[in-house]
UniProtKB/Swiss-Prot annotation:
Family designation: Belongs to the IspD/TarI cytidylyltransferase family. IspD subfamily.
Protein name: 2-C-methyl-D-erythritol 4-phosphate cytidylyltransferase
Pathway(s) served: Isoprenoid biosynthesis; isopentenyl diphosphate biosynthesis via DXP pathway; isopentenyl diphosphate from 1-deoxy-D-xylulose 5-phosphate: step 2/6
Gene Ontology biological-process annotations: isopentenyl diphosphate biosynthetic process, methylerythritol 4-phosphate pathway
UniProt key word Kinase: no
Reaction(s) this enzyme catalyzes, per UniProt: 2-C-methyl-D-erythritol 4-phosphate + CTP + H(+) = 4-CDP-2-C-methyl-D-erythritol + diphosphate
Keywords from the UniProt entry: Isoprene biosynthesis, Nucleotidyltransferase, Transferase
UniProt GO molecular function: 2-C-methyl-D-erythritol 4-phosphate cytidylyltransferase activity
Pfam families: IspD (PF01128)
Gene source species: Fusobacterium nucleatum subsp. nucleatum (strain ATCC 25586 / DSM 15643 / BCRC 10681 / CIP 101130 / JCM 8532 / KCTC 2640 / LMG 13131 / VPI 4355)
Keyword ATP-binding: no
Site (Transition state stabilizer): R24, K31
Length: 231
């Protein structure tokens, strides 16, 4: 339970997105199940969420073929005091998150975290919760672009070079007021919209989102070259 400066306690639900297929990795199993310090990669974020005093409930999303494994894993780790649901993922990340949202009956704030992003820090959660208020519907972690970005056409011809000072590379966690997030996903379902992150959907319903500057080491394990960060 999170208490803001007004001392109003808010219930916080943490969604761990662990249903990715990891196609770009060319591995025998999804990247979130890679070994990291003797545990599956997803456990790094799951453990932090379980131990964070501000988080009340946890929902884990995983692939259909890994549902039984995830249940047994959480049983062995005694995590079901906080883990309320283990949900089957959809064909796209957005559909997976919506599957989890539909399980939530009573909460105020939702935190969404990629299971393949193992370097989650408590400070990201604390800072995100602090800035959610009447004027802010969501908080997302990100870092400034260090490289110049080019916009190209389908033939690889450069069309434009945006000012990188205005560009942010977005990470997770992404934190939202629950009702706003739910409304955004409902809108996406009704209009058949598919976005690459939850913040994009909240933006589409005019939600106000603030950036919290994170760290460059908060990477998502996505391609083979990223495996060196796990050593």
């Amino acid at each position: 339970m999170y208490s803001s400066n007004s001392e109003i306690k808010k219930k916080v639900t943490f969604i761990l997105a662990a249903a990715g297929q990891g196609k770009r990795m060319n591995l025998n199993s999804p990247k979130q199940f890679l070994d990291y310090r003797g545990e599956p990669l997803f456990y790094s974020s799951l453990k932090l969420a379980f131990e964070n005093k501000n988080i009340n409930d946890i929902i884990i999303i995983t692939n259909k073929e890994n549902l039984n494994f995830m249940v047994k894993y959480c049983q062995n780790k005694n995590l079901f005091s906080k883990v309320k649901y283990i949900v089957e993922g959809g064909s796209e990340r957005q559909y997976s998150i919506y599957n989890a949202i539909k399980k939530i009956k009573d909460t105020d704030i939702v935190i969404i975290q990629d299971a393949a992003r193992p370097f989650l820090k408590d400070k990201y959660i604390e800072e995100s919760l602090k800035i959610l208020n009447d004027d802010c519907d969501g908080a997302i972690i990100g870092v400034k672009c260090k490289d110049t970005i080019k916009i190209i056409d389908e033939n690889g011809i450069v069309l434009e070079t945006p000012n990188r000072d205005n560009l942010i590379m977005v990470h997770t966690p992404q934190t939202f007021k629950f009702e706003i997030l739910k409304k955004a996903h409902q809108m996406a379902e009704e209009k058949n919209i598919l976005a690459t992150d939850d913040a994009s959907l909240v933006e589409m319903i005019s939600g106000k989102i603030k950036i919290i500057y994170g760290d460059y080491d908060n990477i998502k394990i996505t391609v083979q070259e990223d495996l060196k960060f796990l050593k």
